[in-house]
């Protein structure tokens, strides 16, 4: 049918096709566009949330999380490192984060707290992941799972820690113009 025939037959015109950007309407990446490491971070965030809120046993949290739909698409080794490394190093991670906070930990959302743990842990232990990728991934986690402006808080804290924890990498990016001075 031609356009004229559609009008004559009373058919409604088709809506324009949506551009596939890999983003949801909220700006978060669609599940199909996520890497296995991004998925690992999401599952680690959920597990760390259970730890922070419910004070559940890490082994039980781990077993529960591995049974969730979609876990098979995640990088299990990265998930293990983030979950167990963050829980085991919680005091050290909090000690690094605390000086950059403008409030007590008790007043911070457990989502933002867990995201900051993930970011600081990755800054320290996942040197194969560029610092800007760590920062961006954590901002995305906070946008997707956290409060309205939680991602801004996470960004400020992690951006403040990056020069301390990844000094050479941050300085190289600043010198090349890839990061702000």
Curated annotation (Swiss-Prot):
GO BP annotation list:
DNA-templated transcription termination; transcription antitermination
Key word Nucleus present:
no
Instruction: Fetch the InterPro entries from UniProt.
Output: NusB-like_sf, NusB_fam, NusB_RsmB_TIM44
What are the recorded GO MF terms, alphabetically?
RNA binding
Give positions of region: Disordered: 1-36
Q: Which Pfam families match?
A: NusB (PF01029)
Going by the entry's taxonomy, the superkingdom of the source organism is recorded as Bacteria
Give GO cellular component annotations, separated by semicolons.
Answer: cytosol
> What are the UniProt keywords, alphabetically?
RNA-binding, Transcription, Transcription antitermination, Transcription regulation
Q: What does this protein do?
A: Involved in transcription antitermination. Required for transcription of ribosomal RNA (rRNA) genes. Binds specifically to the boxA antiterminator sequence of the ribosomal RNA (rrn) operons.
Q: Which NCBIfam families match?
A: nusB
Protein name per the record: Transcription antitermination protein NusB
Specify the taxonomic lineage. Bacteria, Pseudomonadati, Pseudomonadota, Betaproteobacteria, Burkholderiales
């Amino acid at each position: 049918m031609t356009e004229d025939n559609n009008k004559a037959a009373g058919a409604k015109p088709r809506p324009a096709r949506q551009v596939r950007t890999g983003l949801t309407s909220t700006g978060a990446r669609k599940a199909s566009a996520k890497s296995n490491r991004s998925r690992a971070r999401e599952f680690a965030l959920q597990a760390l949330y259970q730890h922070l809120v419910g004070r559940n046993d890490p082994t039980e949290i781990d077993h529960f999380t591995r049974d969730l739909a979609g876990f098979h698409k995640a990088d299990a080794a990265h998930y293990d490192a983030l979950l167990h490394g963050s829980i085991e190093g919680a005091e050290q991670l909090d000690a690094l984060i605390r000086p950059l906070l403008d409030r007590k930990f008790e007043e911070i959302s457990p989502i933002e707290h867990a995201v900051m743990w993930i970011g600081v842990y990755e800054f320290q232990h996942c040197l194969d992941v560029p610092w800007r990728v760590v920062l961006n991934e954590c901002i995305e986690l906070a946008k997707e799972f956290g409060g309205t402006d939680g991602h801004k808080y996470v960004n400020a804290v992690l951006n403040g820690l990056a020069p301390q924890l990844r000094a050479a990498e941050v300085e190289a990016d600043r010198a090349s113009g890839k990061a702000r001075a």
